[in-house]
A protein has these predicted regions:
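Beta-strand-rich binding-surface signature
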Residues: 115, 140, 188-193, 204, ...
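N-terminal low-complexity/disordered regulatory or targeting extensions
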Residues: 1-182, 186-190, 225
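Conserved beta-strand elements of beta-rich interaction domains across eukaryotes
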Residues: 150, 196-199, 249-251
Length: 252
């Protein structure tokens, strides 16, 4: 069951937190040291098998700058040897036939729902680290979180305060100079993309095509055709994301 109406958003958040097994972080925020702590679980490199695995899968992959961090597909466990033996006998399956585990999105969650829930459950320092690592992975960053547990949207500007970028404007192309400034303090042109109503194409996919260098497609924004991108959203509607394009001084 998914919730979409504004009046139901707190219930929707509780639903997602329950699916992700993050209810305990409503009162005690998730901290950076929780993510960096080395435990037997953190040393395992297993694909997520339940929705409760998704937050830790995202955070650990992100800290390792893994481009697959946003995937929320769940892997089905292969049956145990005892179950296999029984099933093969009952179904008259040849002994050399093997069952393979597979991934599935039917029971999964939208990647942006997972991201919103994690950010709302994190303290300010972990939020800062999450956005910093997302920027390094060239993911679009969440700028405004929907009003879920607060009356107003949450602006994540503080979490971006340490981000510094270097670029070469056309005015410095001949001298091969560059500018290096904080993203938060730099004044730059802004273009907004808003989808009005229902469209037959993905706005995010179109933006990825525009922002990607020629012959180097990159998924800055999550879109329908990505793995788990077609899962219905429960809490991420209204999320405002931001990405930057920095000129390199080239003519194209």
């Amino acid at each position: 069951m998914l919730y979409y109406l504004s009046a139901e958003r707190p219930k929707a958040l509780q639903y997602i937190e329950s699916k992700l097994e993050m209810e305990k972080y409503r009162s005690r925020k998730l901290k950076l040291r929780d993510v960096l702590e080395i435990t037997p679980e953190s040393l395992k490199n297993c694909p997520p098998q339940t929705t409760g695995d998704l937050p830790w899968h995202f955070l650990r992959k992100l800290m390792a700058l893994n481009g697959m961090a946003r995937s929320t597909s769940l892997e089905h466990r292969a049956p145990t040897d005892q179950t296999l033996t029984m099933d093969k006998e009952e179904l008259d399956i040849p002994e050399d036939f093997s069952f393979l585990s597979d991934t599935d999105t039917s029971d999964s969650l939208h990647p942006l729902d997972v991201l919103c829930a994690i950010l709302l459950s994190s303290d300010s320092f972990l939020q800062q680290e999450i956005l910093s690592k997302m920027s390094m992975c060239q993911f679009a960053l969440p700028l405004l979180l929907p009003a879920l547990d607060t009356p107003k949207c949450t602006l994540l500007l503080w979490a971006m305060r340490d981000m510094v970028r270097k670029w070469r404007p056309h005015s410095l192309a001949e001298s091969r100079g560059f500018r290096e400034e904080s993203l938060v303090l730099t004044s730059m042109p802004t273009i907004s993309f808003v989808r009005m109503g229902s469209c037959s194409f993905s706005k995010s996919h179109l933006l990825n095509e525009v922002l990607s260098p020629s012959q180097q497609h990159h998924n800055f924004f999550v879109h329908w055709d990505m793995e788990s991108g077609n899962v219905p959203r429960a809490i991420a509607d209204g999320l405002v994301e931001i990405s930057w394009y920095f000129p390199g001084g080239m003519g194209n």
